[in-house]
Regions:
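Structural and coupling elements of P-loop NTPases
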Residues: 1-271
Length: 271
């Protein structure tokens, strides 16, 4: 049960990729996570994962696979219709044609969307042929890396369909923050103003195994965080000085001088 982690993470993000198993469909835990996301006004896109199982284990025909995909997509959109607020229902439903639905195998590191298939001139026939025994593992990996790499398809879809912080904070702040929206601070939050007062929400704290220091990760909604700057801790009712400002390159934290509003980052020196 990751619901506590999910709740904290929802404050730090504006969009999410929802993974659904192609064989099992949308499970109750996935529905719970979708409810949390939609109630926080976090926009979802759909990744139908483990398509390789449908080919290798279930040995489904292309038409049977298509039927399974459509059932998952319909279920996903029904949940959006039931849970999302009226202003987002129509805009946030996913469909295959615009690339907000992705198919793939995270384990085998490939993915496809309609737009990507057109760009690369490939289809599911080529994917099915990957598992017919005519290719070695090295040949399959080479084909995937050249033709349908997971990272490229996912990132293309994220850039195209998920909102920027500047766009998202306009409709998310009124939902997740109960302060005065007409105050200067409220306007800074809504506008994602990098020159405004610092508003950093810590969503996770870990201990660096090398240094033993606490690393506090979270979302910067307003202002610019800089190394050495003094910040006010709202819960502790005291001021402390930031030692390091970090951004993550994959899972590796890298020190930077400063980070503006709208980013996910980490800091040290604040306990």
């Amino acid at each position: 049960d990751f619901s506590g982690n999910v709740t904290r993470a929802m404050r730090a993000i504006d969009g999410t990729i929802v993974l659904v198993c192609a064989s099992e469909g949308i499970m109750p835990q996935t529905e719970t996570v979708m409810k949390q996301a939609l109630r926080e006004r976090v926009k979802p896109i759909l990744f139908i994962n483990k398509v390789d199982r449908m080919i290798k284990e279930l040995k489904l025909t292309p038409s049977a696979m298509q039927e399974r995909f459509l059932k998952i997509i319909d279920h996903f959109n029904i949940l959006i219709e039931q849970i999302a607020e009226p202003e987002f229902r129509g805009k946030w439903k996913v469909n295959v044609a615009d690339g907000s639905v992705i198919f793939g195998s995270a384990r085998d590191n490939w993915a496809l969307s309609v737009g990507f298939m057109k760009k690369k001139n490939i289809g599911f026939k080529e994917i099915i042929s990957l598992y017919d025994g005519t290719m070695s593992d090295d040949e399959r990996k080479k084909w995937i890396w050249e033709k349908a790499p997971l990272y490229e398809v996912l990132l293309d879809s994220v850039v195209k369909h998920l909102p920027s912080p500047v766009e998202a904070q306009k409709y998310r702040i009124p939902k997740i923050w109960q302060g005065d929206k007409e105050s200067q601070f409220g306007k800074d939050l809504i506008e994602c103003n990098k020159n405004g007062e610092v508003a950093f929400v810590i969503t996770n704290t870990i201990i660096d195994p090398r240094s033993g220091k606490e690393i506090n990760a979270g979302r910067l909604f307003s202002g610019t965080i800089k190394e050495g700057m003094e910040v006010y801790l709202n819960n502790e009712k005291k001021k402390q000085r930031i030692q390091q400002v970090l951004v993550y390159n994959g899972i590796k934290p890298e020190s930077v001088g400063e980070v503006p509003a709208g980013n996910v980052l980490a800091i040290t020196g604040v306990v």
